[in-house]
């Protein structure tokens, strides 16, 4: 299945028919009208405030910005929300400073975070027409990136160590040598589905189309490109140049 996801964003940014404010509203706010724009601008400004008063103001006002917020959610400073009405956060969740929750898309579900989830400092959850769902008690450590053009789903009690990268989609076609790769269609392979109680070590990469069974472990630095059954322990990665894009058969190694 191919979707021209990234190319469409580039076209939107270059659309001369829209004002700068209109482009900002479409990419960040996700709802029409000046009222939605002003509400978004004011409430996201609260992310800058320090101390107890900043925490209290975010706790009081962020539920009106987001689609759903449970009791006792802790919002850190300098958070970024895009299309916030499609972001749902369960009770007792903590979102650390500088995290990004981007539910961007026209018809997607957006981001759904379970109860007592931890989203670490600088973590990025980003949708490009896709969806992201995190089960209860899951921990997404600092600087992890979850990028979804289709679907990323994590079960309960999952633990992602720092700098993990999960990408559902993002496999660009590169058959057309006359067109920049970033402007060619993005190929989706079914998303990423991870069962309960899975541990991904630091720097693990999980590619599109992968299913990881419950209670599995991937060692630090692993690249997971195939399905893993329940209770699996996987580690390692290897990249080889296998062919030349210009044709002519396998490339020299």
Named regions from a protein language model:
Residues 1-72, 157, 164, 169-173, ...:
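Terminal amphipathic alpha-helical/low-complexity segments used for targeting or macromolecular assembly
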Residues 210-211, 216:
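Glycine/small-residue-rich hydrophobic helix-like segments
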Residues 234:
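Conserved active-site beta-strand element of glycosyltransferases/polysaccharide synthases
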């Amino acid at each position: 299945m191919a979707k021209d996801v990234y190319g469409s964003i580039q076209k939107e940014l270059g659309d001369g028919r829209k004002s700068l404010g209109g482009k900002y509203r479409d990419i960040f706010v996700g709802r029409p009208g000046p009222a939605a724009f002003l509400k978004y601008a004011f409430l996201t400004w609260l992310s800058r405030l320090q101390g107890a008063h900043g925490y209290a103001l975010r706790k009081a006002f962020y539920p009106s910005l987001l689609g759903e917020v449970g009791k006792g959610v802790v919002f850190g400073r300098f958070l970024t929300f895009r299309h916030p009405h499609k972001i749902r956060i369960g009770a007792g969740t903590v979102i650390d400073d500088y995290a990004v929750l981007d539910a961007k898309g026209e018809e997607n579900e957006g981001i759904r975070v379970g109860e007592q989830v931890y989203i670490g400092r600088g973590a990025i959850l980003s949708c490009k027409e896709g969806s992201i769902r995190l089960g209860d008690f899951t921990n997404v450590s600092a600087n992890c990136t979850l990028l979804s053009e289709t679907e990323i789903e994590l079960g309960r009690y999952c633990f992602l160590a720092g700098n993990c990268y999960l990408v559902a989609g993002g496999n660009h076609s590169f058959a057309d040598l006359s067109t920049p790769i970033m402007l060619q269609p993005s190929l989706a392979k079914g998303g990423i589905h991870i069962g309960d109680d899975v541990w991904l070590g630091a720097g693990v990469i999980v590619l599109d189309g992968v299913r990881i069974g419950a209670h599995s472990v991937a060692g630090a630095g692993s690249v997971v490109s195939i399905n893993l059954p329940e209770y699996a322990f996987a580690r390692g990665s290897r990249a080889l140049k296998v062919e030349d894009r210009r044709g002519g058969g396998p490339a020299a190694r």
